[in-house]
């Protein structure tokens, strides 16, 4: 049973629901504690990765360590601009993969050469942060990346750093959407989903590191290697 109401909403409505998980009765407060609890990958980052980065990069405290800021899942195609109904499979696919409702991406201005009008829908995207981000990362590392056999056909990646935003991004393009377990059982519904771009962005709280792009790039590489992400 999916839960879409927040804790404050339930308090206002004076509702006290109980759910069964693995044949045991779980109260409302316990269910919310399970939903917002730190994931295994979060505990691994706080207890092991941060201490390892402090030793390697000579940080004064753990708060200066580079961290994963957000994960952006994006999909777009020229077919979405012509037919509005064709974007529904991609919209549903992103919602099933991330567990979060995506937003539509629209054209910023009209371009007559490409037959585009302003505010015309081009695709959809999702920005993940916090526990949702780590849950998606854990699924991506342990399930999706291990299913890729031919990397040249189903997968492509690129690395880029931005000195203005002090962000070191790592981009992946999963060309085969059936690699995700949520979409594997519904192959016939998501055949038009050509590819899903996944962008990982890091953030540093260290002022010295943020002014030096080369060192920040090294911190980002150390963080990605600690998560054992594919190159």
From Swiss-Prot:
Cell compartments where the protein resides: Mitochondrion
Which Gene3D superfamilies does its entry note?
Answer: 3.30.1440.10
Q: Which domain of life is it from?
A: Eukaryota
Record GO biological process: translation
Question: What's a Pfam family this protein contains?
Answer: Ribosomal_L5_C
GO cellular component terms listed in the entry, alphabetical order: mitochondrion; ribonucleoprotein complex; ribosome
Instruction: Kindly give the InterPro entries that the UniProt entry links to this protein.
Output: Ribosomal_uL5 (IPR002132), Ribosomal_uL5_C (IPR031309), Ribosomal_uL5_dom_sf (IPR022803), Ribosomal_uL5_N (IPR031310)
Q: Does the keyword Mitochondrion apply?
A: yes
Q: Which keywords does this Swiss-Prot/TrEMBL entry list?
A: Mitochondrion, Ribonucleoprotein, Ribosomal protein
Q: Using the UniProt record, give the first listed, main subcellular location.
A: mitochondrion
GO terms, molecular function: structural constituent of ribosome
Q: Which family does it belong to?
A: Belongs to the universal ribosomal protein uL5 family.
Name of the molecule in the record: Large ribosomal subunit protein uL5m
């Amino acid at each position: 049973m999916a839960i879409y109401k927040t804790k404050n909403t339930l308090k206002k409505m004076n509702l006290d629901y109980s759910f069964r998980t693995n044949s045991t009765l779980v109260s409302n407060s316990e269910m919310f504690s399970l939903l917002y609890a730190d994931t295994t990958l979060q505990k691994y980052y706080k207890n092991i990765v941060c201490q390892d980065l402090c030793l390697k990069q000579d940080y004064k405290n753990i708060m200066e360590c580079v961290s994963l800021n957000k994960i952006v899942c994006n999909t777009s195609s020229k077919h979405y601009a012509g037919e509005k109904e064709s974007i529904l499979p991609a919209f549903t696919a992103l919602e099933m993969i991330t567990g979060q409702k995506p937003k539509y991406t629209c054209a910023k201005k009209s371009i007559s050469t490409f037959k585009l009008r302003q505010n015309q829908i081009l695709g959809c995207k999702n920005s993940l942060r916090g526990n949702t981000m780590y849950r998606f990362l854990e699924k991506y590392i342990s399930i999706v990346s291990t299913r890729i056999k031919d990397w040249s056909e189903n997968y492509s990646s690129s690395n880029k750093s931005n000195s203005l935003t002090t962000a070191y991004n790592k981009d992946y393009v999963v060309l085969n959407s059936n690699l995700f377990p949520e979409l594997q059982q519904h192959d016939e519904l998501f055949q038009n989903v050509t590819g899903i771009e996944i962008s990982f962005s890091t953030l540093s709280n260290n002022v010295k590191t943020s002014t030096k792009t080369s060192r920040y790039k090294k911190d980002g590489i150390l963080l990605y290697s600690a998560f054992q992400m594919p190159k």
